[in-house]
Amino acid sequence: MKNHLIELKQAIYDKAYFNDEEGLELDGFQMVDTIETNAKITVEGENIKSLNEVNFYRKQQRLALRNCGVINPENIDEYIAFDGYKALEKVLTSMSQDDVIKEITDSGLRGRGGAGFPTGKKWMFTKMAEGDQKYVVCNADEGDPGAFMDRSILEGDPHNIVEAMMIAGYAIGADKGYIYVRAEYPIAVRRFQKAIDQAREYGILGQNIWGTGFNFDLEIRLGAGAFVCGEETAL
């Protein structure tokens, strides 16, 4: 008999005991049969209906990770059902490049790296830079020990990254994007490639997207895993 903490549909069950482990493969937490038929759950303590009723969680809201663990990351229809690609549609049909950059600047959005450089300024500088061909480069490599913030989104919500890179491409005038991922993240690579393939199939990536005249496509580049490989000039 083991003590478990279970989270299911925004409800937390503490001191839950699996009294009958027959039919459950615990090695690697792989379920080979349903809990309903092979386990009995006993809940002790005060009944709390949802996480929203817990003071610690009440005012917390997931942003970057909002879909992780909620939708099937390999199903574009589920992403669309959760308002996926609506922001891209709004950008392409009703906003100018400057409008998008102003929105990002006003939001105060910053990079997730240690420098915390304002994203709006980076997009503005790139838009103003001279050049016939521009690119969006997403550095999804992380070399710090135990770091997995980029991998978490790539594995749990890859279409979110596709949409974000497309919005960035529209804002700066780029029609091509590259995402740099270390080869040691096979699940992230596989799921992101599947997201790219699905977006192409749905006409979200490619030429003249939704009849707006905007062209954009994505490509994955695998890295060797060294931290220095993610430095801007090396990348």
Model-derived segments and spans:
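Feature of Fe-S/electron-transfer and energy-metabolism proteins
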Residues: M1-L235
